[in-house]
Amino acid sequence: MGKVHGSLARAGKVKNQTPKVPKLDKKKRLTGRAKKRQLYNRRFSDNGGRKKGPNSKA
């Protein structure tokens, strides 16, 4: 067995000192087919993936 650097009494000291920050709620990311569709629209369409209205000049 290898030698231990320092006392095991201090194990986890920094993690225990760090304040707990709760996770933020985020919108779920698209997966699968929907993600590929979003990528296609982002790369190849001129309006950022949004549908054009009947009166748009885009």
UniProtKB/Swiss-Prot annotation:
Signal peptide coordinates: none
Keyword Cytoplasm: yes
Keyword field: Cytoplasm, Ribonucleoprotein, Ribosomal protein
Pfam family name, one: Ribosomal_S30
Ribonucleoprotein among keywords: yes
Residue span of region Disordered: 1-58
Molecular function terms, GO-annotated: structural constituent of ribosome
Biased composition (Basic residues): 25-40
Primary localization: cytoplasm
One of the GO biological process terms: translation
Gene Ontology CC entries for this record: cytosolic small ribosomal subunit
Disulfide bonds: none
Family: Belongs to the eukaryotic ribosomal protein eS30 family.
Purpose: Component of the ribosome, a large ribonucleoprotein complex responsible for the synthesis of proteins in the cell. The small ribosomal subunit (SSU) binds messenger RNAs (mRNAs) and translates the encoded message by selecting cognate aminoacyl-transfer RNA (tRNA) molecules. The large subunit (LSU) contains the ribosomal catalytic site termed the peptidyl transferase center (PTC), which catalyzes the formation of peptide bonds, thereby polymerizing the amino acids delivered by tRNAs into a polypeptide chain.
Name the UniProt record assigns to this protein: Small ribosomal subunit protein eS30
Source organism (scientific name): Plasmodium falciparum (isolate 3D7)
Gene behind the chain: RPS30
